[in-house]
Amino acid sequence: MDLIPRSIIRTLFRFWTELTSQSSSLAIHELEVAKYKTFASLQYLTCLIVLPWAISISLQNSLESWVTNWWNTGQSKKIFDYLQEENAIRKFEKIEELFLLEIMVKDYSETPSQDIRVEMQKKMIQLVKIYNQDCIHIISHLLANLIGLVLLSVCLILGKKKLGILNSWIQEVFYSLSDTMKAFSILLVTDLCIGFHSPHGWELMINWIFENYGFAHNERIISGLVSTFPVILDTIFKYWIFRRLNRISPSLVVIYHSMNE
């Protein structure tokens, strides 16, 4: 099906319409189809990006009150403690160290040890309140994101026709570029995702996901993901170049390798 490049097929089709004197009506029809594809694609793309994000943000505030009541029952904390236990212990240790440092800096020689324990308990109670609020925020944020993900899946399932139009429009825009611009676009995307400096971006993104979804910070898991994702993407991309681009446009592959060197 992909043995003959699309550009040759389009050229032969236009040449045939010129011979049959249907070029003017075909040009008007192609212009109308191009306008419809562009409008439908941009509308659907905006819907996919904005709608789940807007609904997720609007639901987060309303879900927070319900999550607060659910969290304060006490039974729910057992479900979430294993995710936040390390973070909580780390924060408790940090508060304890800061408080002991404050005792050493200030003159607490005349302060009874009982008063010091009371101050320590106040600090710990304050930290527990902050910990509970963080857990409530993480759970409400997680629920809102899951609802947004479900809505995005529904949009993709119900909008298969528009998704096909969007895919066709993106391919037409890409293939309408010159080989140099195609190679530049591919090189820009690949350098951002799998380039020399990409691990820093992957690390920031994975840390952000861990913090937003309430997972404890684990350097081994993060370093493993950072070292794995770019390799997988690089393999997929090389296969795509070998399987598809090398067959559709060999000149594009040559230009890409020249720019990459």
UniProtKB/Swiss-Prot annotation:
Q: Name one GO biological process term.
A: potassium ion transport
| Chief localisation class | plastid
Query: What topology does the record note for this protein and the membrane?
Result: Multi-pass membrane protein
Query: Can you list the GO cellular component terms from the UniProt entry?
Result: chloroplast inner membrane
Q: Which residues cross the membrane?
A: 138-158, 186-206, 221-241
Please verify whether the record's keywords include Membrane.
yes
Tell me a Gene Ontology molecular-function term this record carries.
proton transmembrane transporter activity
InterPro entries per record: CemA (IPR004282)
Instruction: Give its localization.
Output: Plastid, Chloroplast inner membrane
The record's family statement is:
Belongs to the CemA family.
Return the protein name: Potassium/proton antiporter CemA
Species this protein is from = Cryptomeria japonica
